Design a protein with these regions (language model features):
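Hydrophobic faces of well-ordered beta-strands that scaffold small-molecule active sites
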Residues: 17-19, 37-40, 58-60, 82-87, ...
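Short, small-residue-enriched loops and turns at beta-alpha junctions
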Residues: 2-5, 16-17, 64-66, 91-92, ...
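N-terminal/domain-start segments enriched in small and hydrophobic, helix-friendly residues
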Residues: 41-58, 64
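Catalytic cores of alpha/beta
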Residues: 2-12, 45-53, 70, 83, ...
Length: 137
């Protein structure tokens, strides 16, 4: 992903740029375009860089591989930020992630793994789980 991708995204109507990595070029282009920047982070160095470059939300990826305990370890030195979990987040784990400080989720496989007709129901299941978890926190 690069500056041209950001520009093309804006032309196509994007409001948010979610990137797989932390890139000063991409974050700067995103901010200059007036869009929300959500870079992928997995290490303290990537987190510090993303924040220094102006990221709005930190995309913790791959969430299921790194795990909740790792998130807590890298999140604590960087308080006051908004986090999104992506990569293998299961419906059954939503409450654990929300309690660990995750504000939102990027979902692919958990929504599309069944038939197309089931996608709306899975979206509702995730919405319900997120709201219940936030209300019980």
């Amino acid at each position: 992903m690069n500056k041209l991708d950001v520009e093309n995204g804006k032309k196509a109507g994007a409001k948010i740029v979610i990137s797989p990595h932390t890139s000063e070029e991409v974050i700067n282009a995103t901010k200059n375009a007036g869009l929300v920047s959500v870079p992928g982070v997995a290490t303290p160095t990537e987190i510090a860089d993303a924040l220094r470059y102006g990221a709005d939300i930190l995309k913790f990826f791959p969430a299921s591989s790194l795990g909740v305990n790792f998130l807590k370890s890298v999140r604590d030195p960087f308080p006051g930020n908004t986090w999104m979990a992506t990569g293998g987040v299961a419906l059954a784990d939503v409450d654990t992630w929300v309690k660990a400080g995750i504000s939102g989720f990027g979902l692919g496989g958990p929504l599309t793994s069944g038939g197309v007709s089931d996608i709306a129901n899975r979206v509702k299941d995730f919405q319900r789980a997120i709201l219940e978890s936030k209300n019980n926190s």
